[in-house]
Amino acid sequence: MEAIQRYLQFDRSQQLSFLYPLIFQEYIYAFARDHSLNRAILLENPGYDNKSSFLIVKRLITRMYQQNHFIISANDSSQNPFFGRNKNLYSKMISEGFSFIIEIPLSTRLISSEELKGILKSPNLRSIHSIFPFLEDNFSHFHFVLDILIPHPVHLEILFQTLRYWLKDAPSLHLLRXXXXXXXXXXXXXXXXXXXXXXXXXXXXXXXXXXXXXXXXXXXXXXXXXXXXXXXXXXXXXXXXXXXXXXXXXXXXXXXXXXXXXXXXXXXXXXXXXXXXXXXXXXXXXXXXXXXXXXXXXXXXXXXXXXXXXLWFHSERVYIKQLSNHSLDFMGYFSIVRLNPSMVRSQMLENXFLINNAIKKFDTLVPMIPLIGSLSKAKFCNLFGHPISKSARTDLSDSDIMDRFGRICRNLSHYHSGSSKKKSLYRIKYILRLSCAKTLARKHKSTVRAFLKRLGSEFFEEFLMSEEETLCLTFPRVSSPFWGVYGSRIWYLDITCINDLANQQ
């Protein structure tokens, strides 16, 4: 703190330009750590009143677009190697200001090494770097400093939705969204290697993570650019296709047509375009690309699920995510993704050499421990997986109880239908089946054995073992001269939370 006070005593103009990003830094940390806005977190910033916190945030967002204002620029070192002044403020320079704000808590000139170590070891800390992931290309050394800090990076749209309730000011929020989207689009255009561009639009009433609450087409384009911020090339045609898919009634044919319309722009970038539109708690995923790119359609669907679940899967930084066994928590369900390597040997002629082709298959597993933990929280079983009766449903009719248990079981089997190993899924079905039997036996005040003997075992097989008809996703080979259909196993995203089903009255 003494070093900070020493820097603030240099010059009055320098004090203003230095105080400005410090205030901005504090509130960004407040947004990331879910603290109240009238609470100092890292630095005691002089020169403002805590009671005027909301006004300060509004003024900061508004003055970002005002010219002739002092802003910190890391490239301009005419006055000081650490501080610079730039009078002409444009949208492309906002990223420099954000980058310098990130530099402040990591600078050894301002914060001592012990305080810095304490900040880095904070388990709840989500740095500014995670809120603005498009700054990863500007400072490469953040990959080494912040590897442990970011288990769950914050999605830009989630930040905007949080600011929307705090600021109560639509124009300033649109200014901030335009600034962040412009910098994100510039960073995405600078990336040479283009990955799969995924645009996710979720319903506001559901428990989805990313919610696009913009009516204008430009706001929808900004949401699409934010969703594909992880080294993806988002073209204007792809954004228009995403807006058209969101405007439609989320029909599978309409989504496929939208993906086919964007296939021309996606083929130029040599990447598959995946569009996921969610409406009425049902999501339809469609992808159209070349035959070689269609083989990785499962990976593209995983990228769309990652964008919807606000998890950024960076190709070089997957190890940063502190998730147990590479599991992915998506809308209340758990999924474990694994690459199964296999070897295919081929021989063209009888005396020719054997050719080894290594194949990595994208497969999903049924995670037993997270699912049993989720079922135990919903009071279907205990922590050891032993089924228990659901006392809250004893007042319902028998058909209603069986319908609710059967719906959960069908959703689970439908969600994990792409998994190759179904043994764990059958154990989960057994837990739900016996929990339903115990609930019905408790309602009729009898034992489970007597209740099953009176009704018969086929009584439960009718609604628990019969699964819904599955949807087969086929991908046409657009660029191949041989027209055909490529079918691949895929897991489904049209699922409902266990807790929502368990808490229905």
Curated annotation (Swiss-Prot):
<dbReference type="InterPro" id="IPR002866">
    <property type="entry name" value="Maturase_MatK"/>
</dbReference>
<dbReference type="GO" id="GO:0006397">
    <property type="term" value="P:mRNA processing"/>
</dbReference>
<keyword id="KW-0507">mRNA processing</keyword>
<keyword id="KW-0694">RNA-binding</keyword>
<dbReference type="InterPro" id="IPR024942">
    <property type="entry name" value="Maturase_MatK_N"/>
</dbReference>
<comment type="function">
    <text>Usually encoded in the trnK tRNA gene intron. Probably assists in splicing its own and other chloroplast group II introns.</text>
</comment>
<dbReference type="GO" id="GO:0009507">
    <property type="term" value="C:chloroplast"/>
</dbReference>
<dbReference type="InterPro" id="IPR024937">
    <property type="entry name" value="Domain_X"/>
</dbReference>
<dbReference type="Pfam" id="PF01348">
    <property type="entry name" value="Intron_maturas2"/>
</dbReference>
<dbReference type="GO" id="GO:0008380">
    <property type="term" value="P:RNA splicing"/>
</dbReference>
<protein>
    <recommendedName>
        <fullName>Maturase K</fullName>
    </recommendedName>
</protein>
<keyword id="KW-0934">Plastid</keyword>
<comment type="similarity">
    <text>Belongs to the intron maturase 2 family. MatK subfamily.</text>
</comment>
<keyword id="KW-0819">tRNA processing</keyword>
<dbReference type="GO" id="GO:0008033">
    <property type="term" value="P:tRNA processing"/>
</dbReference>
<dbReference type="Pfam" id="PF01824">
    <property type="entry name" value="MatK_N"/>
</dbReference>
<dbReference type="GO" id="GO:0003723">
    <property type="term" value="F:RNA binding"/>
</dbReference>
<keyword id="KW-0150">Chloroplast</keyword>
